[in-house]
Amino acid sequence: LVFTKSAHTRAALQGIAHLIGPDTHFLSLQNGIGHANVLREMVPLERIAVGVTTWPARVMSPGEVSSMGQGGIRFMPCDGQRSAVFDLLAEDLNRAGMHCSIDPQVQEAIWEKLAFNAAFNGVCAVTRQTVDGLANPQGEALLQRVLDEVLSVAHAHGVAASAERVGAAVRDALDHHRGHQPSMLQDLLAG
């Protein structure tokens, strides 16, 4: 499982290169896009899956992550083919209560989360506001402009990301995640 920030993926893989063998498979649940390109430097595409998780988490200290609330995991092997290894991984994650599914439409979810994160992470970091600081007409208009831009790029790449689903997620965050500091704001405030 790969959870590192995008900028640290290559270094993390280089740090474990001696452990990567002919049976190694990777599931990237990193935010953003393009992670399979870096993972392909270590293993063939058929041993890579990408996905998205909606489990809320926060790094408490080095090596300690806290998760609160509920979420799920959706992923799909990059070659578009189901495999015994990834099927077993999904089963194991479900047994652990992680609500996991293998989903051929996962690119839609990845781009929708990218749009959501681009809006909240970027705007909250630049304005140094928590999520509820954007719950006003000007903040919501700015969020919408970012969402529209990211979704237009998704659509240009042939991904049918849904403005309605992202809009509902944004509304839910504005209504229920008051005081939340998106990760980019956390990083900025941590120095």
Task: Please place each PLM-identified region on the residue numbering.
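Rossmann-like NAD(P)(H) cofactor-binding subdomain of soluble oxidoreductases
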Residues: L1-E64
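A general structural signal for well-ordered alpha-helical segments in protein cores
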Residues: T9, L13, H35-A36, F86, ...
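Internal alpha-helical scaffold of NAD(P)-dependent oxidoreductase catalytic cores
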Residues: H18-L19, E41-R47, P62-F116, N121, ...
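Intrinsically disordered, low-complexity segments enriched in polar/charged residues with Gly/Pro
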Residues: L27, G51-V52, F86, R171-L174
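C-terminal active-site/capping subdomain that shapes the small-molecule cofactor and substrate pocket
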Residues: H155-G191
